[in-house]
Amino acid sequence: MPKLAYKSVSQISGPLLFVENVPNAAYNEMVDIELENGETRQGQVLDTRKGLAIVQIFGATTGIGTQGTTVKFRGETARLPISEDMLGRVFNGIGEPIDGGPEIIAKERMEITSNAINPYSREEPSEFIETGISAIDGMNTLVRGQKLPIFSGSGLPHNQLAAQIARQAKVLDSSENFAVVFGAMGITSEEANYFTNQFRETGALSRSVMFLNLSSDPSMERIILPRIALTTAEYLAFQKGMHILVILTDMTNYCEALREISAAREEVPGRRGYPGYMYTDLSTIYERAGKLKGNNGSITQIPILTMPGDDITHPVPDLTGYITEGQIVISRDLNRKDMYPGIDVLLSLSRLMNQGIGKGRTREDHRGLADQLYAAYASGKDLRSLTAIVGEEALSQNDRKYLHFADTFESRYIKQGFFEDRSIEDTLGLGWDLLADLPVQDMKRVKPDHIQKYGRWKKE
């Protein structure tokens, strides 16, 4: 089908190009923009109305004028050349190699705007993914096919946590093909260098595909990048039978780009200036995670977002929480105490944890042990608040044990090194070690036979 070319550019507003008298432009259709000096840019149709096509430009609008600019409509939506050879490679936000390697010889070209997985086609997630981080594996377990976001704040170590998870994550069955698709949106050059160096130096890059969009890159790339990353994941998972962990950071930058484009289109804003359709837009990303009936592959998602002002009620974390299956919250208070990774286990939640733990998956005592650790840590934190008012001298001997437990739980269980990879057996064993400082008669949430089998209390 021949490309249709138009020279009827009527207006340029921010990253948008308005082309008049285009009768058959289609939503998401790709376009080629040729400047008067022969330079070319790419774009995508965002909207069509009464012959007017609104085109989002990939790149700067510098040099583009209403006179002498030719817009060619390709008659197809954005497609990604895709192959297993993408593993071990680094790409920009529109899928072009930026690591100095050769172009990808595509075995397929897949549309990047794939639909969410049909609920009827979904298989219930049930297999444990080990991250090597106790606060996640032991208390907020990640399950294959789940979408579990990380809520962080400015200056908190979410980048280090993302790199650590990408390096350490694995399924317990070593025969399974496991890989990571990593997508970063709106990051600084320093952060991009950090991620690429970490992936290369630790060997994680060999089983990873990286997509990087810098803060200086066009905002439209931030809209496209997660879709390109997920298209790559879908190919590897559902056509090659691999188990893919998709890490997307920072979804707040993605939503800021969505707001910028919405403002350029002069749409009526919703909460805090974000477009009213942001919930629907986010769902088209998050709902592409999961498992398909009759297919060996799976896609697990860990979107990372920074909460402006540490406000968990901000529209981005708020809407993300509605769509996803829990959240991992990084605490600024724990970070101030140098308790990396600083995960607040009481605010965190994995809604699919019960499907991925227990006998035959992790260990039979996992659920009861996690509940007991939650209860003991919550009691210890309550006693901290009380101690600030009445002093530690007013506490009973038993209360002091719980107060001490909260401190040791943070310093030994939550805190761990950046290169410390704890197995699930190590994590569960550490939990029993910490509980041994409390009276055994207080262990109401673990079964007596589990106490007998795994408990670390000294026998009198």
From Swiss-Prot:
The keyword Transport applies. Its main location: membrane. Disulfide bonds: none annotated. It is a peripheral membrane protein. GO terms for cellular component: plasma membrane. GO terms for biological process: proton motive force-driven plasma membrane ATP synthesis. This is A-type ATP synthase subunit B. Gene3D superfamilies: 3.40.50.12240. Component of the A-type ATP synthase that produces ATP from ADP in the presence of a proton gradient across the membrane. The B chain is a regulatory subunit. Keywords: ATP synthesis, Cell membrane, Hydrogen ion transport, Ion transport, Membrane, Transport. InterPro entries: ATP-synt_VA_C, ATPase_F1/V1/A1_a/bsu_N, ATPase_F1/V1/A1_a/bsu_nucl-bd, P-loop_NTPase, V-ATPase_su_B/beta. It comes from Thermoplasma acidophilum (strain ATCC 25905 / DSM 1728 / JCM 9062 / NBRC 15155 / AMRC-C165). Belongs to the ATPase alpha/beta chains family. Transmembrane segments: none annotated. Has multiple subunits with at least A(3), B(3), C, D, E, F, H, I and proteolipid K(x). Pfam families: ATP-synt_ab, ATP-synt_ab_N, ATP-synt_VA_C. One of its GO terms (molecular function) is ATP binding. It is found in: Cell membrane.
